A protein has these predicted regions:
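Cytosolic-side membrane-insertion boundary helix
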Residues: 358-416
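Soluble extramembrane regions of membrane proteins in the secretory/endomembrane system
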Residues: 30-383
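Alpha-helical transmembrane segments of integral membrane proteins
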Residues: 2-23, 393-700
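Functionally constrained cores in energy, signaling, and assembly domains
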Residues: 26-27, 195, 317, 479, ...
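Intrinsic disorder/low-complexity detector
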Residues: 1-32, 37, 51-94, 115, ...
Length: 700
């Protein structure tokens, strides 16, 4: 076995492994410090509950504060909302003219009616219960519409005319541009002050100004300062972040100056973020002071019962590094409880679950290096640390190629030196995001294969004395542990080479997910055909000869049937990967996942414990019992699927690295149990199958 693996390459891989473990330890410390979850609900959502139930808003706010909500989300207010709560009085020109035609005097708007200056396609605004609110409205209207569309048409009382479409849009037409009544104005000082009075922090969601300029952005922060509220974060609203497209850097500057965190809402597919123009540039200008934010999709929540929704939050915080739980209330009674009681219980249980997993409640945590002054700093490892990783990963790739093509040591070293220098230059000089992605792909595809080649060679070495079933099970158990450890070398490389704030937040993502599932299967198949002359009728030659013989095989009906089964398996295998899978998950499997989530710290992946690891045990059984090579090869391919899945888990950079390691161990434990059951079942059934086979052949 020693002659097949270059000890120099092994030494380089060992050095890289030490570096990767050090970098992953640093990452673990950063993830451990990021331990605060913000529990957020919308101010207007709680206001809606109060109105719906006929309760005091003060009582509702106090109840949700006690239940565990730490922050209220405040949007830009609108003329429609302020008119509904009586702070101002707003009416369309068309309504005034119709009222006048019916004999009405216009009330507060009588002066403009009497002068005959009412424009149908306009909105007229005057004071309601608050002069302060009217003052803010006038300020916001000038910022949003400018002097050309706005004029004061009366002084006592002050009446403002805004030209524009006054139509109120229903929910069915939400994608239309809102009219003047529903268009965003600015943040409500009144709402932010009320949030402060009840002990809440505030997350603001102002909409972008069209067009934008420095003063309009400054107006947002003047309003925040005026309120005196503790505003901890900003989440975009609409289709653009504030400052898009030309003032993103300035918006980031103001957010950082206010010590605010940028909340980025996870996409409902759980892959990256809800689309918004300027989202990623703002995150970069914020130096990745970003909190991943989770909201249950509105359409999905309508289908959920409260207990189903409840189980998601703490698990999401732990597995996907969510740090803002953006909770929308249930607006339909459930379980015989009104919406206030239902939602108070919902929030309280979320808070309890989050804290039970070791998190604190408060302003959202962020990924930050441990700086001397305690200030925020994004985590990007020193580029020099990536150089030994690059050489180690390339050494693994060259080791595999040597198994196929029998490279001399001279060629191995030339390939390593050339590839290592190119990778090092791109990493040191440019940061090499593409190089890091490529290195991660090599590590994720090659090391599971190398792991299985070691095990197969071990089987070849040990199978001369065919053991009984018990000894096979014992051997396969420690051999699977060895395979997992060897695959974890590649997993550690993946986690280390991609480890920085942008990947932790999933702003950058690993791009080779589908290839990581397919390539190990292809690579182990090529190696196995080369090593054991499978499908070549005993003819010895290089990989090209084996492939030529393979593609020269006469196709029969049984081949077509086999390929059909293989295509279906591949469709399920690849189609179930990623976040936009076209293959639905059966209800029984969903229940099994829920059970495993409750029973284990990190639910293992089905490809490991249901496919890969049981196949490993059966492959060991087949090897020791000297089954036909084709059957051995198919089982080894199945075992490689498990090892590849194990490594691919570490490419989910938003998942804490320690959880990925524990997931691998959990997968090993559960897979070993199923594998042992599979071997026992086969060993019991095999004599009957062989007996039936002999009878069948006798009758032929």
């Amino acid at each position: 076995m020693k002659s097949r693996y270059n000890p120099v390459l092994i030494a380089i891989i060992a050095i890289g492994l030490i570096v990767s473990l050090w970098l992953n330890y640093q990452r673990h410390e950063i993830e451990q410090r990021n331990d605060t979850v913000e529990m957020a609900m919308e101010y207007e959502g709680l206001e809606h509950i109060a109105n719906w139930e006929g309760l005091s808003l003060n009582d509702v706010l106090a109840g949700f504060k006690k239940a565990g909500v730490t922050s209220l989300v405040v949007f830009d207010t609108t003329l429609e909302k302020l008119n509904n709560n009586g702070s101002i009085v707003a009416v369309t020109g068309e309504e005034l003219l119709k009222g006048s035609a019916l004999g009405g005097d216009g009330g507060k708007f009588a002066p403009v009616l009497s002068e005959g200056i009412v424009v149908p396609n306009a909105v007229y605004v005057t004071v309601g219960t608050s002069y302060d609110v009217l003052t803010e409205v006038v300020e916001d209207l000038y910022l949003r519409y400018g002097k050309d569309r706005l004029r004061i048409v009366n002084n006592e009382p002050q009446i403002i005319e805004i030209l524009g479409n006054p139509m109120v849009i229903t929910e069915e037409n939400y994608d239309s541009k809102p009219g003047v009544m529903q268009a965003p104005l600015g943040l409500s000082t009144e709402e932010m002050r009320k949030a402060k009075a009840f002990g809440f922090n505030v997350i603001v969601r102002p909409m972008n100004y069209l067009p934008n300029d420095y003063d309009k952005i400054r107006s947002i922060f003047r309003r925040i300062d005026k309120s005196g509220a503790n505003v901890t974060g900003y989440i975009g609203c609409g289709r653009e972040v504030v400052g898009y497209p030309d003032y993103i850097a300035y918006m980031a500057h103001k957010l950082k100056k206010q010590n605010m965190t940028f909340g980025m809402v996870e996409h409902y597919t759980q892959l990256q973020f809800a689309a918004m123009d300027g989202l990623l540039p703002l995150a970069e200008h914020m130096d990745y002071r970003v909190a991943r934010t989770y909201i249950i999709d509105k359409a999905e929540q309508r289908k959920l019962k409260m207990p189903e929704a409840l189980r998601r939050w703490a698990l999401t915080d732990e597995e996907r590094n969510i740090r803002i739980n953006y909770i929308k209330p249930f607006m339909i009674p459930q379980e015989g409880r009104d919406i206030l009681e239902l939602n108070l219980d919902y929030v309280s249980k979320i808070a309890d679950d989050v804290q039970a997993r070791g998190y604190k409640l408060g302003p959202a945590g962020v990924f930050s290096k441990n700086t001397a002054d305690g200030k925020f700093a994004p985590y990007f490892p020193e580029r020099a640390w990536l150089v030994p990783l690059a050489f180690a990963i390339l050494a693994g790739g060259i080791m595999y190629l040597t198994l196929l093509f029998n490279f001399s040591k001279k060629i191995q070293y030339m390939l390593l030196l050339t590839g290592g220098i190119v990778a090092s230059v791109t990493l040191l000089k440019f940061g090499g995001i593409l190089t890091r992605q490529l290195l991660a792909l090599i590590a994720a595809t090659v090391f599971p294969v190398l792991s299985m080649t070691v095990i197969v060679e071990l089987w070849e070495f040990c199978k001369k004395n065919t053991p009984n079933t018990l000894k096979i099970i014992i051997s396969a158990t420690w051999q699977l542990a060895l395979a997992v450890i060897l695959s974890l070398i590649g997993a550690s490389f993946v986690a280390a080479v991609l480890g920085d704030s942008s990947f932790f937040l999933e702003i950058d993502i690993y791009k080779g997910v589908k290839l990581t599932f397919i390539l190990p299967v292809l690579l182990i198949s090529l190696w196995y055909m080369q090593r054991f002359n499978v499908l070549s009728k005993g003819q010895i030659g290089n990989i090209a000869v084996h492939l030529k013989n393979f593609f020269s095989t006469r196709i029969t009906v049984k081949h077509v049937a086999f390929l059909g089964v293989l295509a279906f398996v591949a469709y399920i295998f690849v189609g179930r990967s990623g976040h936009t899978a076209g293959v639905p998950v059966p209800a029984l499997e969903i229940k099994m996942r829920l059970f495993l989530e409750q029973m284990m710290y990190a639910r293992p992946r089905e490809k490991e414990f249901m496919i890969g690891h049981p196949a490993f045990y059966l492959a060991a059984f087949a090897a020791y019992k000297q089954a036909p090579r084709l059957w051995q090869m198919l089982l080894v391919v199945g075992a490689t699927i498990g090892q590849g899945s194990l490594v691919q888990t570490f490419a989910h950079m938003r998942t804490p690295v320690i959880m990925s390691y524990i997931r691998a161990v959990d997968g090993y434990a559960l897979g070993a149990v199923l594998g042992i059951i599979a071997v026992i079942a086969v060993s019991i059934l095999l004599p009957y199958v062989q007996k039936w086979q002999r009878r069948f052949l006798e009758h032929e």
